[in-house]
Amino acid sequence: FFKQKTAYEIASCLVGSDGHRELLTHVQGTVDGITAAKGRVCGVAARGTRSAEVYSFSAGGEKRLTCLNENYFATHDAAPVETWRFMRGGTELEAFALLPEGFDPARHYPAVVQIHGGPKLAYGPVFHHEMQVMRAQGYFVLFCNPRGSDGRGNAFMDVRGRYGQEDYEDIMAFLDDALARWPQIDRARVGVCGGSYGGFMVNWIIGHTERFACAVSQRSISNMVSMFCTSDIGYRFIADQCGATPWDDMDALWEQSPLAYAHRAKTPTLFIHGAEDYRCDRSEAMQMFTALRYHGVESRLCLFEGENHELSRSGTPSQRIRRLNEILAWLAHYLKPEPGKKQGVNKI
């Protein structure tokens, strides 16, 4: 099984002991797992505006074997993802957007920029529940694959020792391109959200620009020194990703820490963290939250008891609903025409 060009232009194949490859499928979407047994190849895949189902793959194409979510999609709309490419510094970058429900070219709309984790992950034109909820509530939802993302080769993916540099600039250039493409986006009502590495980037962004009206930082990293010493990912990860340890180059770690720039932040920020997150310890959120409060920036910290780094994906259902409601309420307060109006998740 291999990926070609991007993580969402999937080519999957069987490789024989003689090196012969048999192409099974090459379509836009995701394949989260693939297995071969008794002459069949099956996997969990997502296609278009539908969530993941079980598929079988063969040289003749693919066949969906399950219809687990048809009742949901019979009563809930999901919009297709707009896709395009743009250039920055001679590098082609992938860009995506969901247009707000009932989009009217004569109106202006708020927007939310979403930043994926990893950074060795990738977005694509597939169903994403949280983004569809935001779209249904009247937002442009903008997302891209900056340098550091998966699917484009090792050179593109390698931002080690340079977190917050090319990746940050790519995201800012992406937003500029999206604003030029859709003048219906109200530049004064753009928010930014991200989790894990995406949370790191949100923390970094608020210390480097004031162009966002609000921010949501989830399961984030704020201090590479404390991250080195507390994360269950192991100390070798930060040493590799940042190119330093606390003992051979403390300055290098601090320079790549959003906390170092928190005194510059002006953006109202919501922090969401699992209380039992051992990948990015809850102290990462607490440090950034405390720094913003100390410097007089409006902020809110939500710690979810019993939840870990996987809150948004496999957390307790009631907690996942609460998380999404917290995000939507924060965005609505700062981005909607009626400040403070609570927004729920009952539409999708």
PLM ranges: what are they?
Residues 1-20:
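Single conserved hydrophobic/aromatic residue that forms the stacking wall/gate
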Residues 17, 42-49, 58:
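Beta-strand C-termini and the immediately following turn/loop, strongest in propeller blades
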Residues 17-32, 57-82, 169:
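Multi-bladed beta-propeller domains
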Residues 143-348:
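Active-site-proximal cap/loop segments of hydrolase catalytic domains
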